[in-house]
UniProtKB/Swiss-Prot annotation:
Belongs to the universal ribosomal protein uL4 family. InterPro entries: Ribosomal_uL4, Ribosomal_uL4_dom_sf, Ribosomal_uL4_euk/arc_CS, Ribosomal_uL4_euk/arch, Ribosomall_uL4-arc. Transmembrane segments: none annotated. One of the primary rRNA binding proteins, this protein initially binds near the 5'-end of the 23S rRNA. It is important during the early stages of 50S assembly. It makes multiple contacts with different domains of the 23S rRNA in the assembled 50S subunit and ribosome. It holds the Pfam family Ribosomal_L4. Part of the 50S ribosomal subunit. PANTHER family: 60S RIBOSOMAL PROTEIN L4. This is Large ribosomal subunit protein uL4. It comes from Methanothrix thermoacetophila (strain DSM 6194 / JCM 14653 / NBRC 101360 / PT) (Methanosaeta thermophila). One of its GO terms (biological process) is translation. GO terms for molecular function: rRNA binding; structural constituent of ribosome. GO terms for cellular component: ribonucleoprotein complex; ribosome. Keywords: Ribonucleoprotein, Ribosomal protein, RNA-binding, rRNA-binding.
């Protein structure tokens, strides 16, 4: 499988034979499994304080008082400690001892990454994620892109390559999150846009970090979650020419 190489002005400058990884079978089931495992392994154990709701001297009055036999505070009739009482303990709360991580076979994980990489070269799968682009896929750029250190320079490249519309899609798609996540540091939901993969960070990481929805990663740290956000493969990806060599050696 061949692909065109473009420079940072968006002009074609040659062709490259892509690694065999781009011919991998599309396996959405494995990709989903790998992404969910990665997300699960980031979770922290959580649970209430061991004595939450039980820090009280409440005792039951016992039978013979014409009221239920729930524990009651010493200075009154109000129930305490039990789950149905105000301020009482939770019934069946989450426990820190629960194992939240998930295991995945190493061969499955690698095959999922290979499959997600191959999906970035299929226009129908990329378009199904909602990405906006013009031109052929995959997008391979000469190694000079790795030395771009200014966001304005990266913006000019994305406009020349016909990818800027996707960045604007991500910018305009930023919405206030539904639910309590709003007050837990996750107020906005940000759509994912372009993924830039390079062999080394010679400045491109700094240039890309302030563009909405754009992510940067070196080829040696590429994973299934970056290639398939939300378990959906086909992320619009820009590959630097040297990164393909690293990818071929790694996978």
């Amino acid at each position: 499988m061949n692909a065109k190489i473009i420079d940072i002005s968006g002009n074609p400058v040659g062709e490259i034979v892509l690694p065999a990884i781009f011919d991998e079978e599309y396996r959405p089931d494995l990709i989903k499994r790998a992404v969910l495992a990665a997300q699960a392994n980031r979770l922290q154990p959580y649970g209430p304080h061991f004595y939450a709701g039980m820090n009280t001297s409440a005792r039951s009055w016992g039978p013979g008082h014409g009221v239920s036999r729930v524990p009651r505070i010493v200075t009154g009739r109000r129930a305490a400690a039990v789950p149905m009482a105000r301020g009482g303990r939770a019934s069946h709360p989450p426990v820190p001892s629960k194992v939240l991580s998930e295991k995945i076979n190493e061969k499955e994980r690698i095959k999922a990454i290979r499959s997600a990489v191959a999906a970035t070269a299929k226009p129908d799968i990329v378009a199904a994620r909602g990405h906006l682009f013009s031109g052929e896929l995959p997008i391979v750029v000469r190694g000079e892109i790795e030395s771009i250190s200014k966001t304005s320079e990266l913006r000019r490249f994305l406009m020349a390559a016909g990818l800027w519309d996707d960045v604007m899609r991500a910018k305009n798609g930023r919405k206030v999150r539904a639910g309590k996540g709003k007050i837990r540091g996750r107020r906005f939901r940000q759509p994912r846009s372009i993924l830039i993969v390079a062999a080394a960070d010679n400045g491109i990481g700094r240039a890309a970090r302030n563009l909405p929805g754009v992510d940067f990663v070196t080829a040696d740290r590429l994973n299934a979650e970056l290639l398939a956000p939300g378990t959906h493969a086909g992320r619009l990806t820009v590959w630097s020419e040297p990164s393909l060599k690293v990818l071929e050696e790694r996978l």
